[in-house]
UniProtKB/Swiss-Prot annotation:
Record organism: Trametes versicolor
Protein name: Ligninase B
GO terms for biological process, alphabetical: hydrogen peroxide catabolic process; lignin catabolic process
Family: Belongs to the peroxidase family. Ligninase subfamily.
EC number: 1.11.1.14
Top class in the EC scheme: oxidoreductase
Length: 13
């Protein structure tokens, strides 16, 4: 998911 840095960090981990 593309989004501002830090927003989706947990989702993309």
């Amino acid at each position: 998911v593309t989004x501002p840095d830090g927003v989706n960090t947990a989702t993309n981990a």
